[in-house]
A protein has these predicted regions:
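Aromatic sugar-binding surface patches on proteins
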Residues: 100-111
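Proline/serine/threonine-rich low-complexity linkers at boundaries of modular beta-sandwich domains
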Residues: 28-49
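Hydrophobic/tyrosine-rich beta-strand signature of extracellular beta-sandwich/beta-rich modules
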Residues: 124-126
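Surface-exposed, short loops/turns at beta-strand junctions within beta-sandwich domains
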Residues: 114-121
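Extracellular acidic, Ser/Thr/Pro-rich low-complexity tracts
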Residues: 57-58, 67-75, 86, 130
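Short, solvent-exposed loop/turn segments at the edges of extracellular beta-sandwich modules
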Residues: 25, 128-134
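C-terminal motif of bacterial Sec signal peptides marking the signal peptidase cleavage site
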Residues: 17-20
Length: 146
């Protein structure tokens, strides 16, 4: 009897763990798709630092925008995204999605080479969340000149 209970507990734990680590949904933070079962003990939001670029930094066409920083969480991260959007028309210029289950600290680094014929304003948005639905978002503006 003990053996059967042990197997049942292991199977239940495995199913719950698989559900908690599902890859469903998007990293937009809109909860527009399936999301893992939230962790009721995870109440602290991740800490997000964006090192580069700086807010309102000016680039010239052909320059590379490097987006670097660090995300940490006390109980582990779930997923995130980094996006560069053209403010004039809403075009998504670059998107990097992350699934980094239960990682406590992650250094991110992506690059985007700019090409413009007229001065353009871009928004850089960095978003990450943990398994408790807690999230951290930072957005900043940059300008690209021809």
């Amino acid at each position: 009897m003990k053996h059967r209970i042990y197997i049942l507990v292991l199977m239940t734990t495995g199913v719950l763990l698989a559900m908690a680590c599902s890859k469903g949904g998007s990293s937009s933070g809109n909860n527009d798709g399936p999301h893992p079962i939230p962790s009721p003990v995870d109440t602290m939001a991740p800490a997000l630092t964006v090192n580069t670029p700086s807010s309102n930094q000016v680039f010239t066409s052909g320059n590379v925008i490097n987006i670097t920083g660090r995300i940490t969480d006390d109980l582990g991260l779930y997923r995130g995204s980094i996006r560069i959007t053209n403010d004039a028309n809403g075009t998504l210029l670059k998107e990097q999605l992350y699934e980094i289950h239960y990682v406590l600290a992650y250094d991110f680094n992506i690059s985007y080479t700019t090409y413009v014929t007229t001065a353009s304003d871009y928004t850089v948005t960095v978003f990450f969340e943990d398994h408790g639905y807690n999230s951290a978002t930072k957005s900043l503006k940059v300008k690209v000149n021809p």
